[in-house]
C-alpha cells in the first residue's frame, strides 16, 4: 500500500446525486416510488422513497463543509461539492492528510437501512444494485484512494448473498449492513441461523461486515423528536456510538461471532470509551448468569478480540491501548458529516495520539485498515 500521509479513514460518507436512481432504474415501472427529490411547500427539497421521507427531511448530510456545521443543506444547490464530487473530495482528503477513504452511503442510510424498510423486495434490490453500481463507476473509478463498500437487500437472505458476491466481483471491499434488520421490517431475528449464509459468504470472500452506529435508531434513548434542534443533534451524536453496546452484546451472546470464526466485524462510529466497560461487563455477566456453562467456547471479550474492530475519530487513544489493544482499533475522519474532525483533522490526530508509541499509532491509523481491506 502506498501512503503519503499515514492515515486510512475507515468511515466516510458519499452524498448520492438526485438522478442516481431515476436514471438507473425503470421510471415507467416504479415511478415516484424510486428515491427522488421533492420540493416541499416551504421551498426546501427532501428525499423520498416509496412514499417515505428520508434524512429527516434534509437533502443531504454535509455539516462539516457547511458555513454553520449545525445546519444541513435544505436544497441541492446548497450541498457542498466535496460531498458528491470525487475530485473535490480528494482535495479535502489531501488537506486533511487522508490517504484512503472507506465509503458509506447517506441517502440510502448509514448502512442501507432506508431501502431495508421497503416492503417490495424487487424495488429494494433495484435500489441497492443501482447504488452499488454507481459507487464503483463514479467513486472507485475516480481514484483507488476510495474504498467502496456495498449495501445489501435484507431479505431473502439468498438475494443478499447473491448481491454480496456480485458487488465484490465488481470491486467492493466491504459489506455495509444494518445491525438489527428486524427493526426495519418483518424479517427473522439477526441472532438466528437464517443469516448464517450471509456471514459465511463474507468469510469466504474475505470482506468485513461493517455495522454503523445509528443505523438502528430505536437503540438510541431518549428519542430526539420534539427537542430543540441543536440539542437533539448533540443528543443523537452522543448516544449513537453507545448503541453499539447492544449490538456487540447481541452478536456475542447469540453466538453469531462464535459460529463464524473468520468473520471480521467493523463497528463504525463506535468510539472507544464504552469498549472497556463492555469487555469487562460482558465477561462478568457471562460468568454471573451461567452462560459459561451453556457450551460457549469463548468469552465475549475473546470473541471481540478474534473478530471485531472499534472505530473512533476523537478519543484519547493511549488510555485504551492496554485493554482494547492497538490491533482492534480503526480511525476515521467522518467526512463530510457534522461530527467530522474536518477542518482540524491533522490537529485532532496529534492530540488524540499523544503518548502513543509509533508502532501502535501505525496500527490504528493505517496498518489495521490496510490489512482489513486488502490494500
Regions picked out by a protein language model, each given a short descriptive name:
Residues 123-124, 139-146, 152, 158, ...:
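Catalytic pocket-lining loop regions of alpha/beta-barrel enzymes
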Residues 8-15, 210-214:
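Histidine-centered catalytic micro-motifs
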Residues 68-74, 109-123, 158:
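Surface-exposed, active-site-proximal loop segments in enzymatic domains
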Residues 104-109, 213-219, 335-337:
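Short glycine-enriched loops at secondary-structure junctions
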Residues 105-119, 179-186:
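Glycine-rich, proline-tolerant flexible connector loops at the mouths of alpha/beta enzymes
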Residues 19-22, 113-116, 221-224, 277-281, ...:
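Short aromatic-enriched loop/helix-cap "lid" or pocket-rim segments at secondary-structure transitions
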Residues 1-8, 16-72, 77-80, 85-100, ...:
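Mid-to-C-terminal alpha-helical segments outside catalytic/metal-binding sites
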Residues 74-83, 118, 146-158:
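Active-site mouth loops of central-metabolism enzymes
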Amino acid at each position: 500500500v502506498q501512503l503519503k500521509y499515514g492515515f486510512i479513514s475507515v468511515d466516510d460518507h458519499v452524498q448520492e446525486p438526485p438522478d442516481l436512481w431515476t436514471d438507473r432504474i425503470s421510471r415507467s415501472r416504479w415511478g415516484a416510488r424510486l428515491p427522488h427529490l421533492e420540493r416541499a411547500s416551504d421551498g426546501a427539497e427532501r428525499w423520498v422513497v416509496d412514499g417515505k421521507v428520508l434524512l429527516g427531511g434534509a437533502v443531504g448530510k454535509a455539516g462539516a463543509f457547511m458555513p454553520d456545521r449545525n445546519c444541513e443543506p435544505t436544497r441541492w444547490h446548497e450541498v457542498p461539492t466535496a460531498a458528491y464530487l470525487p475530485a473535490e473530495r480528494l482535495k479535502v482528503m489531501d488537506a486533511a492528510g487522508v490517504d484512503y477513504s472507506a465509503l458509506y452511503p447517506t441517502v440510502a442510510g448509514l448502512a442501507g437501512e432506508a431501502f431495508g424498510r421497503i416492503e417490495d423486495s424487487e424495488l429494494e434490490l433495484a435500489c441497492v444494485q443501482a447504488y452499488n453500481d454507481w459507487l464503483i463507476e463514479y467513486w472507485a473509478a475516480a481514484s483507488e484512494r476510495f474504498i467502496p463498500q456495498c449495501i445489501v437487500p435484507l431479505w431473502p437472505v439468498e438475494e443478499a448473498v447473491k448481491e454480496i458476491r456480485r458487488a465484490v466481483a465488481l470491486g467492493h471491499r466491504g459489506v455495509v449492513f444494518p445491525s438489527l434488520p428486524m427493526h426495519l421490517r418483518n424479517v427473522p431475528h439477526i441472532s438466528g441461523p437464517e443469516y448464517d449464509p450471509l456471514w459465511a459468504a463474507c468469510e469466504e470472500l474475505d470482506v468485513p461486515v461493517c455495522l454503523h452506529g445509528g443505523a438502528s435508531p430505536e437503540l438510541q434513548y431518549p428519542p430526539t423528536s420534539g427537542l430543540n434542534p441543536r440539542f437533539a443533534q448533540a443528543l443523537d451524536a452522543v448516544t449513537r456510538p453507545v448503541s453499539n453496546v447492544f449490538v456487540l452484546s447481541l452478536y456475542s451472546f447469540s453466538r453469531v461471532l462464535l459460529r463464524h470464526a473468520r468473520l471480521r466485524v467493523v463497528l463504525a462510529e463506535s468510539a472507544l470509551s464504552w469498549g472497556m466497560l463492555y469487555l469487562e461487563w460482558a465477561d462478568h455477566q457471562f460468568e454471573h448468569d451461567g452462560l459459561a456453562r451453556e457450551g460457549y467456547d469463548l468469552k465475549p471479550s475473546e470473541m471481540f478480540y478474534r473478530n471485531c474492530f472499534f472505530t473512533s475519530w476523537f478519543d484519547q487513544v493511549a488510555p485504551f491501548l492496554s485493554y482494547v489493544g492497538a490491533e482492534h482499533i480503526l480511525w476515521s475522519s467522518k467526512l463530510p458529516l457534522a461530527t467530522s474532525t474536518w477542518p482540524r483533522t491533522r490537529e485532532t490526530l496529534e492530540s488524540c495520539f499523544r503518548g502513543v508509541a509509533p508502532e501502535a499509532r501505525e496500527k490504528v491509523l493505517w496498518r489495521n485498515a490496510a490489512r482489513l481491506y486488502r490494500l
